[in-house]
A protein has these predicted regions:
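Class II aminoacyl-tRNA synthetase catalytic cores and aaRS-like
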Residues: 1-169
């Protein structure tokens, strides 16, 4: 029983109980557990219950595409409350178009009008229906910020911040 407590008091008490329970099973649990608020989770992972083991972070590219010839991105980049975000699926650059289209179908269930993507093939080639609209500077900035390597698949969402986070999460 606890009186006059806040969220941190409850979380700290539960951490102690969990650490003790795991300790009795021979598993050491480091404390304190990492804590993040809702907005940090959504902004970084696109989910309010992120699986942090994989390091697949959403990356904000809004500033890169503010003057893009790709109107979908330029519009979102210049609209209050909207963003251009992306996620790098490392090693997925060889996925077939059908598999990417299937992901676009899943994204549409979250309200996406589409799922923009760029596949960076192992042989150095690039496959994408949108890359023709990007300047060399935009591509260079994208590659750097997304830490793109041959074999990667970068997927984008553009529009209202929370919707874009949910689509990519």
């Amino acid at each position: 029983e606890m009186s006059f407590v806040d969220q941190n008091d409850v979380m700290s008490a539960l951490e102690e109980v969990l650490a003790d329970a795991f300790g009795r099973m021979g598993v050491e649990m480091p404390t304190p557990l990492r804590r993040m608020d809702y907005w940090e989770a959504m902004d970084t992972y696109g989910s309010d219950k992120p699986d942090t083991r994989y390091g697949m972070h959403l990356v904000d590219l809004t500033d890169i595409f503010a003057n893009s010839k790709f109107k979908v991105f330029a519009t979102a980049a210049n609209e209050e409350g909207s963003v251009v975000k992306a996620i790098n699926a490392k090693g997925a650059g060889a996925w077939a178009r059908a598999k990417i289209d299937k992901l676009a179908g899943v994204a549409s269930t979250f309200g996406a009008k589409g799922l923009a993507w760029i596949a960076f093939r192992e042989d150095g080639s690039i496959n994408s229906p949108i890359v023709k609209f990007f300047s060399d500077e935009e591509m260079a900035a994208l590659r750097e910020r997304m830490d793109v390597e041959p074999g990667d698949l970068v997927m984008f969402a553009a529009g209202p911040r929370l919707l874009s986070d949910e689509i990519l999460g």
